[in-house]
A protein has these predicted regions:
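Alpha-helical membrane-protein topology signature
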Residues: 1-168
Length: 168
């Protein structure tokens, strides 16, 4: 059962990301470049914090790899535009998490900071969908959200480090 629960988030992430990446490359979807750059960068910090705490799961590992693919797909098809101040603040928040991690020697600090900033980085995507509902398909987002369920069900030890990433 544990193998199934470990594999299911990977399968759901692949099912969500594959048509999303294809749609981006075909220019049918127009995701926020800044959101995906921030997410892939901060997913790297989140994964590092979870690995350091011994709490990494298949959802974050597959999600991290796929977020990198999505980011590079987005960068491949979008024009370079100046970064907004808010977008720079999101990346600075991730850097702040790394600094806190170094100062406190506690990877949970970096994990919490990165996850908070990841949630804030959703704002440009939500603004884009509000202004142009056709810019983002709903199914990949729903499948990605459902990928958290098997991770939560399979947790042996409910700690903040284990449960925070799948919940957010």
């Amino acid at each position: 059962m544990s193998l199934t629960l470990s594999a299911l988030p990977v399968v759901l992430n692949l099912c969500a990301s594959t048509p999303y990446i294809v749609g981006i490359l075909q220019k049918r979807f127009r995701p926020s470049r800044s959101s995906w750059i921030v997410w892939s960068t901060l997913d790297s910090i989140t994964l590092a914090g979870m690995l350091a705490k011994g709490s990494a799961n298949t959802q974050i590992i597959s999600g991290w790899l796929l977020s990198l693919l999505i980011m590079f797909s987005v960068l491949h098809v979008t024009k370079a535009t100046p970064w907004k101040r808010r977008e720079k603040l999101y990346l600075a928040g991730g850097a702040f998490g790394i600094v806190l991690w170094g100062l406190t020697s506690d990877p949970l600090t970096a994990l919490i900071t990165s996850l908070a900033v990841i949630e804030c980085a959703l704002v440009p995507t939500l603004e884009g969908v509000w202004n142009d509902p056709e810019a983002e398909p709903a199914i990949p987002w729903l499948l990605g959200g459902f990928a958290s369920v098997p991770v939560l069900v399979s947790l042996d030890h409910w700690t903040l480090a284990n449960a925070l990433q799948p919940i957010l």
